[in-house]
Design a protein with these regions (language model features):
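Flexible, acidic/Gly-rich N-terminal and inter-domain linker regions that tether
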Residues: 1-104
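Conserved Radical SAM active-site core
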Residues: 93-160
Length: 160
């Protein structure tokens, strides 16, 4: 069984070309891109302005690899939230949300695992597994935005 491509990994122009390859009009790329990156859809069946046939075709060709929240901890001291996310392959990554007057900042993982050995961080257990895709890094931000119902305004990327 072949692994499907992650549709979130495509830049806008690449998505247009992919849809043309599938026999679709270029304007569909804008609709899908908006579902993926503005409305934060995790499934093709959420894309209600696309025909059922197109959604089925997309599901045959592509996956949307969402990160799934496994755990959330909130600091009683300052309200900082730490998230543990599960990736499509079972690897786990950590992200941190810090709320400020000027907006929401997140620290996201760029790697599954870590070689640094910091005692306060669960990511270091087991060492470095692999680098994350851009889509997986975006997925952390998107999931946090969905969970808190607010926009993230600043991003810090953790990794070695």
């Amino acid at each position: 069984m072949r692994m499907k491509k992650d549709i979130r990994a495509y830049e806008y122009e690449e998505l247009q070309k992919e849809l043309e390859r599938l026999g679709e009009k270029p304007f569909r790329a804008k609709q899908i891109y908006e579902w993926l990156h503005v409305k934060l859809a995790d499934r093709f069946d959420e894309m209600t302005n696309l025909s059922v046939k197109l959604r089925e075709k997309l599901a045959e060709e592509y996956d949307i690899f969402p990160v799934q929240m496994a755990e959330r901890q909130q600091s009683k001291l300052d309200g900082t939230n730490k998230f543990l996310f599960r990736l499509y392959d079972g690897n786990m990554v950590e992200s941190v949300l810090m709320r400020y007057k000027h907006g929401n900042s997140v620290c996201i993982s760029s790697q599954a695992g870590c070689r640094m050995g910091c005692v306060f961080c669960a990511s270091t257990i087991g060492g470095l597994k692999r680098n994350l895709s851009a889509s997986e890094m975006l997925g952390q931000i998107y999931q946090i935005q969905k969970i808190i119902g607010e926009r993230v305004s600043n991003v810090v990327i953790m990794g070695t």
